[in-house]
């Protein structure tokens, strides 16, 4: 067996150009496979984390009749005693934090510019606000009655900076419209322009007073130490006239897109591997026909058909190892670089999902192992037919072929 591998190595050395092209095809294939796996994993990882941290949380507690699409602050749709409920939930095992939030629809305007916005009343001290990175100014304090925090894209469109004034109109609990001036205390960025341009944050107490919600809230926003425990924690939350939803319940589209992306990457992998198989088969067939006389001599000297198959598979395996080594290095470098700087896609979004402006590829070790093993096995399988063809050549006909 060792002698066959030595022969295979010499054969590859005698045909350096063909060997290099075959290894290059495999290395390019593996590079693409690794980068695409990292890209789609990074995309779904980012959209999942952003959607959970900014929108749904791991668990939400709502009033039974609350409709998040309407953003109504009518009392019958809101939770009573939200601070007390949030404190009870926060005391449960596995809960990282729980905080009340109030949602209302409104219009922000400055001069002759205006924009529809979602008003979110938050507890300024809650760690749930960490995704709202303040890039200018500061977060309004809990007792601030005229301060507001706005997204960077909204500040740009309304031509506002910290300290400027804007008018905010809100639909109140009584079904009326109220309007008040606010001072821009700070400007935030979450990394998603689509989200940031439609959100303004107020201290919860001010949002309640401004909208006429009293001491009520729209939801209790809950984050866990492990999101996979959402169902177990949700089962432990009970109360009258409330509805408890897990992140899977609230993000069916996100889960579906995640499953679809797995199927999509599988199809792309098959296409790339199919092209690679074609290149390898053609290269190996070319090698067989170019070495017809050599095969005839080996057969005449007593080499069995099985040994010829092993010889060609040994050549294929050595090519695979070389191509895989280069592919692993280039794929890792590519994924690492873009995983650090990101790939800018700009203002994009899908209803029901929050996506950042940049996608950061994320290469997982299990993907590296899976794709590496797959590439090696595919190379051997692609080489088997040419090897089998070589093993079936008759010595006399093979020797006559190049006379």
Each predicted region: which residue ranges?
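Short, membrane-interfacial amphipathic segments enriched in basic
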Residues: 1-6, 242
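Short helix-loop junctions at transmembrane helix boundaries
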Residues: 325-370
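Mechanotransmission and gating elements of multispan inner-membrane complexes involved in transport
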Residues: 172-265, 272
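Hydrophobic, regular-secondary-structure patches
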Residues: 37-116, 143-144
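C-terminal membrane-exit region of the final transmembrane helix in multipass inner-membrane proteins
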Residues: 9, 363-403
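Hydrophobic alpha-helical transmembrane segments of multi-pass inner-membrane transport and secretion
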Residues: 16-43, 259-294, 317-326, 374-381
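Transmembrane alpha-helical interface segments in multi-pass membrane proteins
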Residues: 285, 294-338, 370, 378
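Hydrophobic secondary-structure segments that place a key small or acidic residue at a functional site
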Residues: 102, 113, 117-123, 135-205
